[in-house]
Amino acid sequence: MARYRCCRSRSRCRRRRRRCYRRRRRCCRRRRRRVCCRRYTVIRCRRR
């Protein structure tokens, strides 16, 4: 299962080994809450 998180700056995501994709307003699922991304959507993959 993949976890979705929202990021404000791409550099911050890249620093945490995450990939940032710029998309329109998209809804991400963070644990049991729904977070909306404005510009960047970060997709965190399962470790190894």
Curated annotation (Swiss-Prot):
UniProt-listed InterPro entries: Protamine_P1
Molecular-function annotations in GO: DNA binding
GO biological process, one term: chromosome condensation
Organism: Eptesicus fuscus (Big brown bat)
Listed Pfam families: Protamine_P1
Keyword Phosphoprotein: no
Tissue: Testis.
Domain of life: Eukaryota
Name assigned to this protein: Sperm protamine P1
Main location: nucleus
Localization, UniProt: Nucleus; Chromosome
Family, per entry: Belongs to the protamine P1 family.
Gene Ontology cellular component terms for the protein in this record: nucleosome; nucleus
Keyword field contains Metal-binding: no
Keyword tags: Chromosome, Developmental protein, Differentiation, DNA condensation, DNA-binding, Nucleosome core, Nucleus, Spermatogenesis
